[in-house]
């Protein structure tokens, strides 16, 4: 039996803002956001680009990562992404 993976992901929007989310399929979820069928936030800020994702073994951990990211300042979000290997030129 294959274990299900859960993901916390970060998109960078057309206005250079970040959007953090949770999903079980990162590629499909990013496409949904770009189709205007995702969150209201990204619908108004398309196109979006997948910037970062992290895999978790359980849903709770992925949701906690999403919550923590969403409640940080822009500067802390940038520092988080840089600490996880994303170059600042990508945002």
Curated annotation (Swiss-Prot):
InterPro entries linked to this entry: GIY-YIG_endonuc, GIY-YIG_endonuc_sf, UPF0213_domain
Sequence similarity: Belongs to the UPF0213 family.
The protein's name: UPF0213 protein LCA_1266
CDD domains registered for this protein in UniProt: GIY-YIG_UPF0213
Ranges for domain GIY-YIG: 4-79
Transmembrane residue ranges: none
């Amino acid at each position: 039996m294959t274990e299900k993976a859960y993901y916390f992901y970060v998109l960078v929007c057309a206005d250079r803002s970040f959007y953090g989310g949770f999903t079980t399929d990162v590629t499909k979820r990013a496409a949904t956001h770009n189709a205007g069928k995702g969150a209201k936030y990204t619908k108004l800020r398309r196109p979006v680009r997948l910037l970062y994702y992290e895999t978790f073994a359980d849903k709770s951990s992925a949701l906690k990562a999403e919550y923590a990211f969403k409640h940080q300042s822009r500067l802390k979000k940038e520092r988080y992404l840089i600490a996880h290997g994303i170059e600042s030129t990508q945002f």
